[in-house]
């Protein structure tokens, strides 16, 4: 059984969902240590998006989420509007919306092969937004040519409680090493 379980992104998840995950973990392993992890989101240049119309994407497609870090970054940055790209999507991207109807007002991630990049480029250029917020780990601006700036939303793991991950690792190693 696990010694430690990390529940990540607790700062953006619903409290009830985090509690349910915690209950499921302790039901299976009552002695497990649980560490809450956070995912602070930062825009490379928040002033570029403030009070502007933005397109969010490419971002989450699988996993049942209707939005991801880029959407959260947009709402926190006080953008004027998040443009729904569905009306501007080329057929390849429109097919993704049909396959994953849970996707909200975001441009879905579908891959980075040449045809997929071309579909992404055309859809972005068609969408009447001032700027794109991209939360994908890839540097999208280096792969496609678009008629609006691309601002990256970045996130990483952060601890928010004591004991922290290092403390738990020391405890674990002390318990198993002679």
Sequence positions of predicted segments:
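P-loop NTP-binding site
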Residues: 32-33, 38, 42-178
């Amino acid at each position: 059984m696990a010694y430690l379980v990390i529940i990540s992104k607790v700062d953006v998840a619903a409290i009830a969902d985090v509690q349910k995950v915690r209950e499921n973990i302790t039901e299976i392993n009552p002695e497990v240590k649980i560490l809450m992890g956070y995912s602070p989101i930062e825009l490379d240049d928040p002033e570029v998006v403030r009070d502007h119309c933005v397109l969010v994407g490419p971002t989450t497609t699988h996993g049942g989420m209707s939005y991801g870090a880029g959407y959260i970054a947009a709402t926190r940055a006080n953008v004027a509007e998040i443009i729904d790209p569905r009306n501007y999507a080329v057929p390849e991207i429109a097919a993704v919306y049909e396959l994953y109807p849970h996707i909200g007002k975001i441009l879905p991630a579908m891959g980075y092969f040449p045809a997929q990049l071309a579909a992404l480029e055309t859809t972005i250029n068609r969408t009447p937004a001032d700027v794109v917020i991209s939360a994908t780990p890839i540097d999208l601006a280096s792969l496609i040519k678009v008629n609006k700036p691309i601002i990256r939303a970045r996130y990483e793991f952060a601890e928010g409680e004591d004991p922290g991950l290092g403390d738990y690792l020391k405890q674990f190693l002390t318990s198993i090493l002679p």
